[in-house]
Amino acid sequence: MELNSLLILLEAAEYLERRDREAEHGYASVLPFDGDFAREKTKAAGLVRKAPNNRSSHNELEKHRRAKLRLYLEQLKQLVPLGPDSTRHTTLSLLKRAKVHIKKLEEQDRRALSIKEQLQQEHRFLKRRLEQLSVQSVERVRTDSTGSAVSTDDSEQEVDIEGMEFGPGELDSVGSSSDADDHYSLQSGTGGDSGFGPHCRRLGRPALS
């Protein structure tokens, strides 16, 4: 596009110079002076003088762009799987393969995100379950400790009863009660062994003559 514009400007400048030469030699009538026309003529002449410089700079830019494009294509060859005949691929085939490869990567990315979400849900569920089990374990420990405390109190009460000290009167009553129980047991055992009732023990021995 820029090259076409430069060619048009060059043709316009040559036309203006040709008209000027014809006017100087009397081949054509000179137009009345116009300031705008003069400014356009000066501008066109400046563009003609700058045209070679613009063309060279344009060539440099184009060369730089092509070199950068080749570099990008080489980098793309390293990223896209091309197969054994990678040297025979054209730029168009390389771009098509790159497009297919990008779609595969996007599909893999979607699957990976789905798996990641599932794992996060499982992690949250397991975390809540662990918290519930921890609470139940603490409650069970509290229940066991309460039961052991009650058992300890009962055993302490038994020990206190066994180690209780009695006064003289209380000891006599306990002893008499124990003696009465022993006497009743003895009578029962004697009567059972000899075949006589409890009244037989009241008979004294006969007096000797």
Swiss-Prot record:
Keyword line: DNA-binding, Nucleus, Repressor, Transcription, Transcription regulation
Bias (Basic residues) ranges: 199-209
Pfam families linked to this entry: HLH (PF00010)
InterPro entries documented for this protein: bHLH_dom, HLH_DNA-bd_sf
Start and end residues of each stretch annotated as Disordered: 140-209
Classification via PANTHER family: MAX DIMERIZATION PROTEIN 4, MAX DIMERIZATION, MAD
Subunit relationships: Efficient DNA binding requires dimerization with another bHLH protein. Binds DNA as a heterodimer with MAX. Interacts with SIN3A AND SIN3B. Interacts with RNF17.
Protein name: Max dimerization protein 4
Gene name in the database record: MXD4
